[in-house]
Amino acid sequence: MRSAEWGRVLSLRTPHSELRTQTLSGDYSSLFSGAYEHSVDDKGRTVIPARFRQKLGEKFVMTRGLHGCLWVFPERTWSGVQQKLMPKSLLDDRGIKLERYFLGAASECAPDRQGRVAIPPMLMAHAGIKSGESVWVVGLTDKVEIWSRARWDEFNESLTDEIIAGLGREAEMPQYG
């Protein structure tokens, strides 16, 4: 897809579009896509695909994601995510809960020479990831997700063509063809 088309797609109004457009740099070659299956070793490490490591940089931030997965952000975009999650005031209970959920669980990570990254125990528990099992490492535009195989399969099995079409209409996705 050409950059102009990505710009059109990224300017859509979705529940998370404000956060996303603030964290993307405008260089669409840095966007993530694709899914890779890897195993988790007995030390809680998994491989981040080379293609993703290149875009994530030397250091990145891993935190809780929605739907029982983990989110991994490039360090260069993490400050934008943090700013968007800041509560409006010290008394903003909802904002504080969001901040606590995502920022409180955040962990700075760096891959080793084999491209493996250690998943902190708290994040493994959140995502249902266990040593010796498979995970899916999924590129999702401005971030990478890490899913336990069981949750990834369950999530995908729950989606039908009708659900996807409905979500596309709600997000006002442009028609291509």
Where are these regions (language model features)?
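Flexible "stalk/tail and boundary" regions
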Residues: M1-H38, D42, F52-Q114, P121-G177
